[in-house]
Amino acid sequence: MKKTIAGGVWPVMITPFTEDNRIDYDAVLRIIEWYDKNGVDGIFAVCQSSEMFELSPQERVELAKFIITNTPKHMGVIASGHCAEKVEDQIREAQTVIDAGVDAYVFISNQFAKENESEDVAKKNIEYLLDHIDGDMFGVYECPAPYKRLLSPELLKWCAETEKFAFLKDTCCDLDQLEAKCKAVEGTGLKIFNANAATLLRSMEMGCAGYSGVMANFHPDLYVWLCKNYKEQPEKAQELMNFLGAASMVECQVYPVNSKYHMNLVGVPMTLQSRRQDYKLLTGSKKLEIEEFCAITETFRKSFFGK
């Protein structure tokens, strides 16, 4: 495996399904190609956006392997699927994905301890997982479900000092916390990726390495530009950030169904099937909102890039 992962944009990959509710691997390939076309740095596979809690253990592993195998070599792949109840099953699934060649296996932070348990318990359980999984690069995702466990700067620093952690998908959505976390891992190999669009620019100025969030399933190219150019073109970056922050409110709609509808609009065909929620919740008016969102994004894109 690589010893580090690239900064930049890592979309949280959605999972397309066939009409009879199987994983649509042809559509998975089309999504990978679309990510590549839009210049992202890597893919975060088998995460909450992938509906990992609704996938069987076998599906989680097979999906991860397929994405690892079919992603172009210039793009990275990290993957989770860390949602088995028994720790023995967690270890076995993680090892299978690592052995398939993933760049980093990503743990779910709420799996480290129960909601009422302390961070000391979480730390001991992290140590146990590291001792029983043969891998040299890991990540952590502060997944909101089934409950959100945010890592303290102190625990994050400890993770960095193990020299085995390269990735944190941070979901605190709070600039003060992000600044403290960035300071805690400064000079280490652990990179923090913000999942929150509105705070992204400020967080990168504080030291975050990039974006790993929902909106990279709508207009990843804009996030790629921001991550690559915010230092050299700060005024233009702020203009873009104003649009991205406002546009990110679309994730409060019927996600991930709305992203699947949007993918169809931009030439990546798939069904709207979802195991997380009824796709019919994306009503006619909500579809129209996504169509208008797509149109205004294109208008902004042409204005911003002068095309």
Residues covered by each model-derived region:
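Active-site beta->alpha loop and helix N-cap motifs at the rims of alpha/beta catalytic domains
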Residues: 2-150
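C-terminal alpha-helical cap/extension of soluble enzyme domains
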Residues: 8-14, 38, 208, 215-307
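General structural feature for long, well-ordered alpha-helical segments within catalytic domains
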Residues: 24-27, 31, 59, 63, ...
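A generic alpha-helix structural signal
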Residues: 32, 64, 94, 182, ...
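Short secondary-structure capping/turn micro-motifs that flank functional sites
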Residues: 51-52, 113-114, 176, 201, ...
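Short secondary-structure transition/capping segments
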Residues: 55-57, 117-120, 180-181, 205, ...
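Catalytic alpha/beta core domains of metabolic enzymes, predominantly
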Residues: 128-136, 143-255
